[in-house]
């Protein structure tokens, strides 16, 4: 009996082992790796704000309206064609945020080649309020002078783009080789030596998006409240959080 029980138990053990062997889970074929998905690059907030916000449009229109209102006082009794307003081009009259957006999407930096290609597209849109302001200047008997640090080779494309956004400039002064400082060009406008046939002008206002767009100004004045006394009177600045001479300032 004992031997029978042992044999029976041994038989059960064998059956259990055999049965268990049939339940072994074999490893499944490894799944192929999921294809990588290119995640769209986020547009930096400063570019998004410039391109999409209501606040930006309110600020540019507000600035140009203030400048137009001041003209009535500054030019009262002044002979027509004897005075002028000097404006910067980029981010003052011409909106190049599409160029900045493309650079962000491509994760690429500014280059002269990419910038030249963009300018030659001649598709920059107008800064809100700019065209209406320049038309107001002409209606009051003034002249519009654009002083820009675009290269001389880009001047024709710049003039064409200005006309496309309904800005009729009486004079466009691009950057002569080696002269990034705008002050000499400002002086030539005043002296009547800026271009043949362009008479000396009493410059009554300057408008720009960079502190360097204003006579004798630089980032060094930022801690001197007295240096800003002409802003809102004859100098009018537009917001540009995308780029500018401010980028060269080191945090304290």
Regions found by a protein language model. Give the residues of each.
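Solvent-exposed, polar/charged alpha-helical surfaces in well-ordered, non-transmembrane soluble domains
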Residues: 65, 69, 128, 132-135, ...
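Active-site neighborhood of HAD-like aspartate-dependent phosphohydrolases
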Residues: 75-82, 93-125, 139
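Non-catalytic pre-domain segments flanking phosphatase-related domains
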Residues: 23-87, 249-252
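Bacterial N-terminal signal peptides that target proteins for export
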Residues: 2-12
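Bacterial N-terminal signal peptides
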Residues: 11-21
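Acidic helix-start/capping segments at beta-turn-to-alpha-helix junctions
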Residues: 83-93, 152-154
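Short, acidic loop-to-helix structural element flanking the phosphoryl-transfer center
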Residues: 116-145, 152-153
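C-terminal cap/substrate-recognition subdomain and adjoining C-terminal extension
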Residues: 54, 142, 151, 155-252
């Amino acid at each position: 009996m004992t031997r029978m029980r042992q044999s029976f138990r041994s038989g059960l053990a064998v059956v259990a082992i055999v049965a268990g062997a049939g339940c072994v889970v074999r490893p499944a074929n490894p799944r192929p790796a999921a294809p990588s998905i290119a995640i769209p690059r986020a547009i930096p907030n400063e570019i998004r704000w410039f391109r999409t916000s209501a606040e930006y449009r309110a600020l540019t229109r507000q600035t140009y309206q203030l400048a137009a209102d001041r003209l009535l006082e500054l030019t009262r009794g002044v002979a027509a064609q004897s005075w002028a307003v000097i404006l910067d081009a980029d981010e003052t009259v011409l909106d190049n945020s599409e160029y900045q957006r493309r650079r962000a999407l491509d994760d690429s930096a500014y280059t002269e080649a990419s910038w030249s290609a963009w300018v030659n597209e001649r598709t920059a849109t107008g800064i809100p309020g700019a065209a209406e302001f320049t038309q107001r200047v002409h209606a009051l008997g003034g002249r519009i002078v654009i002083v820009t640090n675009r290269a001389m080779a880009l001047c024709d494309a710049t003039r064409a783009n200005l006309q496309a956004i309904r800005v009729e400039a009486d004079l466009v002064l691009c950057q002569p080789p080696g002269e990034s400082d705008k002050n000499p060009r400002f002086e030539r406008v005043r002296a009547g030596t800026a271009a043949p046939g362009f008479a000396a002008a009493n410059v009554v206002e300057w408008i720009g998006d960079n502190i360097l767009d204003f006579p004798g100004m630089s980032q060094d004045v930022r801690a001197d409240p007295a240096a800003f006394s002409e802003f809102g009177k004859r100098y009018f600045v537009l917001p540009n959080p995308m780029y500018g001479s401010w980028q060269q300032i080191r945090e304290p």
